[in-house]
């Protein structure tokens, strides 16, 4: 009896195989191609699920949802051109740069200060300036401050994800200078130091204040400068530019937060 049952099952299996082959053979080439192009609905759903899971796994190596990305420094660069009867300036600034610089204002000491600003802030900076140096360096220094402030404002954008605030104390031999900044979209300069000499080379020391006032006004930022110590004017001015560079670099860097650092929701 067992042998007969086995034989019956074998015959039944062979019959199914033959029926399948016959069904397949009875289909036209067009029908077979159509089946290959349009698999069953269940197969489609499985494929979509796999693709979605693969994309999710590529974006996040863990199962936890990925945190929203900060926007800090995603487009942190700007190029400004400004021409007046007193100066002609083209300035390029990249805040998330590498400390590269190419500066030519026609005022050697001022170039030196701006190069230090770029290097210590790790900014890329290019300035081509032609000013009325036959008068003095006042217009050149102030107007470069105006254009630099405009470039900073453009480069920081909506300030999402940025630290916004920073304070840096810069030593340089006898000089010690504190600079605090706030990228708040409000202009304010606090710089109450009076230099003991009128010039360093061709550079007029009183223009330091005019430069930072222009930057603050055009960038929409608070700048506080405190000369804590120092006797050498060159060192004091250089420490001021470097302190400003370091403070600004911290203020524009990524805080890890989402959005702007303000209860108002915008700056």
Model-derived features: positions:
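N-terminal intrinsically disordered, cationic/polar leader segments
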Residues: 3, 56, 71-267
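Polybasic, lysine-enriched low-complexity intrinsically disordered terminal tails
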Residues: 1-65
């Amino acid at each position: 009896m067992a042998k007969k049952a086995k034989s019956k099952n074998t015959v039944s299996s062979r019959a199914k195989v033959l029926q399948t082959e016959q069904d397949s053979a009875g289909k036209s080439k067009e029908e077979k191609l159509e089946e290959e192009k349009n698999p069953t609905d269940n197969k489609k759903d499985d494929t979509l699920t796999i693709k979605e899971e693969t994309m999710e796994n590529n974006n996040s190596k863990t199962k936890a949802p990925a945190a929203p990305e900060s926007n800090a420094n995603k487009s942190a660069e700007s190029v400004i051109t400004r021409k007046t009867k007193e100066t002609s300036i083209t300035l390029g600034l990249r805040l998330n740069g590498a400390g590269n610089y190419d500066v030519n204002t026609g005022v050697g000491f001022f170039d030196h200060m701006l190069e230090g600003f770029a290097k210590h802030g790790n900014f890329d900076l290019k300035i081509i300036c032609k000013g009325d140096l036959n008068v003095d360096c006042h217009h050149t220094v102030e107007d470069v401050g105006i254009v630099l402030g405009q470039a900073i404002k453009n480069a920081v954008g909506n300030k999402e994800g940025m630290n916004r605030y920073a304070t840096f104390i810069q030593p340089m031999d006898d000089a010690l200078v504190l600079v605090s900044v706030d990228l708040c979209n409000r202009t304010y300069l606090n710089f109450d130091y009076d230099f003991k000499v009128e010039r360093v080379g061709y550079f007029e020391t009183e223009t330091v204040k005019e430069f930072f006032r222009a930057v603050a006004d055009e960038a929409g930022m608070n700048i506080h400068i405190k000369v804590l110590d120092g006797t050498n004017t060159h060192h004091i001015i250089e420490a001021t530019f470097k302190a400003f560079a370091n403070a600004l670099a911290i203020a524009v860097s990524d805080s890890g937060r989402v959005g702007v650092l303000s209860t108002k929701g915008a700056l």
